């Protein structure tokens, strides 16, 4: 079959394109701008069109569109006029879920890292798993693969537009649940209701892996047989949070040493009501949030029969996904890091990790807020998200699919943030010029956001290198 994909330059739709190519289908696609993801698809034989035009769907047997594509999109309208079936991401996920054993990683934060770790652990054990990951993962060489149909298909189960409800997981992870995608879910209760429905799609509750440190995850996965994971220190701070059962997978004695993290893993045996030390694990990721991501991946891989040595080797080797604490480079003694964090909780966790990694250095943070609806709804939560930063700069809002005034909303957000050095800095080019002028040797610049704010760091590092 010939599938034409609208929005093929995005992580989610390019992943679908790779799977379809693996299955032997013909793939074409269109987007407003090419990138490394479309280049990789072209190298595999996909036909990529610039911009959007009804002519691009010629010869297509089916059209695949992202949930964000408007109903009056020219290619979508042309497909319907010609009787070409229009599929959403959920339609393909549902079909694949019926063909494969699915491991689904759901949650507001941490999905990409956890999904990638599980896929890498299965691969390290000699398997050929399928996977769909929402970020480029150098250790796997690609962010989506069909793999061996007899092996599990590991899916980053995105909740946007309730797409994850198309899956019927054999194993599922719930990393955390905290209101997001406010354009789809008008209230926290509405958001949690979707996750509650997702947990019910797991046939056996003991194959549901839940973060016991997260109150939201515990609320939606309220089953005594669900396995829990968490960090000993977090449990000590909030013992009431662990109300389903003792921690089945618990990290203790977490140690950060520069770019490395070590922790001891304790496993609880529900049959003997006792815990045993499984050993010490090492990884190249920093931050408590990444310890939790690692615990979830270890739990899933163990459940799927992967030996401990393969799990430990994969965890130690994992270098992270692109745009997840992604060190872009260093120039003039200034380190520039980019992260996809676009929710206050994600930003807070990323800043804590940066402070642990660079305890003595000045931390300059640039945030490009993502969408007007999210920025407005979570404005109060942003107020205290920058406690670990020394300097905070807020860029214009990245509108994505929404309309509004990027600058006015950014200035309003900057005014709500409780910090003694916070300013709004305009668009990407203006932000790069302003921030570049205040950086000094020894600084760490951290760019945050799900849009194109990473360009601020790229522009600054190019300028610094030209000065040498």
From Swiss-Prot:
Task: Look at the named UniProt entry and state the broad enzyme category this protein falls under.
Answer: ligase
Q: Where is the signal peptide?
A: none
A Gene Ontology biological process term: peptidoglycan biosynthetic process
Recorded catalytic reaction(s): these are: UDP-N-acetyl-alpha-D-muramate + L-alanine + ATP = UDP-N-acetyl-alpha-D-muramoyl-L-alanine + ADP + phosphate + H(+)
Compartment annotation: Cytoplasm
Chain residues that bind ATP: 107-113
- GO CC field: cytoplasm
Q: In which pathway does it act?
A: Cell wall biogenesis; peptidoglycan biosynthesis
Q: Which GO terms describe its molecular function?
A: ATP binding; UDP-N-acetylmuramate-L-alanine ligase activity
Q: Which UniProt keywords apply?
A: ATP-binding, Cell cycle, Cell division, Cell shape, Cell wall biogenesis/degradation, Cytoplasm, Ligase, Nucleotide-binding, Peptidoglycan synthesis
Q: Which domain of life is it from?
A: Bacteria
Q: What is its EC number?
A: 6.3.2.8
Q: Kindly give the NCBIfam families that the UniProt entry links to this protein.
A: murC (TIGR01082)
- Family membership, please give it: Belongs to the MurCDEF family.
* Described function: Cell wall formation.
Q: What is this protein called?
A: UDP-N-acetylmuramate--L-alanine ligase
